[in-house]
Amino acid sequence: MGLEKSFILFSLLVLVLGWVQPSLGRESSADKFKRQHMDTEGSSKSSPTYCNQMMKRRDMTNGSCKPVNTFVHEPLEDVQAICSQGQVTCKNGKSNCYKSSSTLHITDCRLKGSSKYPNCDYTTTDSQKQLIIACDGNPYVPVHLDDSV
């Protein structure tokens, strides 16, 4: 009887671990948004090499060069607040996008035409624009930067 209970408990443990394990170490959409788009310090954003450094540092040049990316130089709370501002339709047709009511300080990074992996070379453009972001989850948080206008 004791051996049977142990086997059942062991089987349940294996089942639970098999269910939980795949999500361990997987980056959430909210964490990916922060990694790819948030740079509150923006220490060298005015430098022409800012995008080259940040794209590499944030793992967006592993295996290929990400063609376009935007870094936001505002507090995370300000970006999260966009999720309760003006709702708009996302580029993919979904209805979970929101447009910031004011402009935010951003840096656009665009892959130069002649650039090829592994030598990813980006142009750096500093500007003030409104952001359109997709929000999801509970709590409702940014998960995708859809556009800047």
UniProtKB/Swiss-Prot annotation:
Q: Where in the cell is it found?
A: Secreted
Q: Which GO terms describe its cellular component?
A: extracellular region
Q: Please report the name of this protein according to its UniProt entry.
A: Ribonuclease pancreatic alpha-type
Family listed: Belongs to the pancreatic ribonuclease family.
The entry's keywords = Disulfide bond, Endonuclease, Hydrolase, Lyase, Nuclease, Secreted, Signal
Signal peptide interval: 1-25
Write down the EC number. Answer: 4.6.1.18
Assembly with partners or alone? Monomer.
EC class (word): lyase
Purpose of the protein: Endonuclease that catalyzes the cleavage of RNA on the 3' side of pyrimidine nucleotides. Acts on single-stranded and double-stranded RNA.
Which positions are catalytic residues?
Answer: H37, H144
An example GO BP is: defense response to Gram-positive bacterium
Q: Which PROSITE patterns match?
A: RNASE_PANCREATIC
Top-level taxon of origin? Eukaryota
Name the reaction it catalyses: an [RNA] containing cytidine + H2O = an [RNA]-3'-cytidine-3'-phosphate + a 5'-hydroxy-ribonucleotide-3'-[RNA]; an [RNA] containing uridine + H2O = an [RNA]-3'-uridine-3'-phosphate + a 5'-hydroxy-ribonucleotide-3'-[RNA]
Cysteines joined through disulfide linkages: C51-C109, C65-C120, C83-C135, C90-C97
| UniProt: substrate binding residues | K32, R35, K66, P67, V68, N69, T70, K91, R110
- Keyword Lyase on entry: yes
Among the GO molecular function terms of this UniProt record, one is: lyase activity
- What species is given as this protein's source? Rattus fuscipes
Which taxonomic lineage does the organism of this UniProt entry have? Eukaryota, Metazoa, Chordata, Craniata, Vertebrata
